[in-house]
Amino acid sequence: MRHGMHHRGPMMGPMMDPRSRLFMALANDQRLKILTLLKEGEKSTAEILEALQLDPSVVSRHLTLLRNVGLIQARKEGVSQRYTVADERIFEMIRLASAIIKDWLDKHLEFFE
C-alpha cells in the first residue's frame, strides 16, 4: 500500500490543505446528490437513503465525510439524525464549477462541429 493511501482512496488527514479536503469531498457524484437533496431542506437519514438507493454503510460514510469538512450538519431527532447544509455558499461554488465546465465544453466542442 502506498504512503498516504488506503483501500478507499486518498486519505484526508489533518495535514491536508483544507481546500483540498473540501474539493475532495465534492469530487463524488453521491455526495453531490446528497448536497442537492439538502438544498431542498432538512432531510432524515432515511430520506437520504431512499433517494440514493445505496447501502446504508456507504451513505453513512458519505454523510460523515461531508460533516467532517463542514459542508453539512446533523441534529438528533429521537433515534434518527436530520441533516442540513452548513453553509449555503457551497451551492454558489457548485454553480461556478458548472459554469466553468460549460464554458470549457462550449469552447472545445466547437472544434468537433
Residue ranges and their predicted role:
Residues M1-P18, I90-E113:
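Amphipathic alpha-helical dimerization/coiled-coil segments
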Residues G13, D17-V58, E77-R89:
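N-terminal helix-turn-helix DNA-binding core of bacterial DNA-binding proteins
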Residues E42-K43, R67, S98-I101:
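Residue-level detector of secondary-structure transition/capping positions
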Residues E50, R67-N68:
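Alpha-helical residues within the helix-turn-helix
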Residues H62:
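Residues within the DNA-recognition helix of helix-turn-helix
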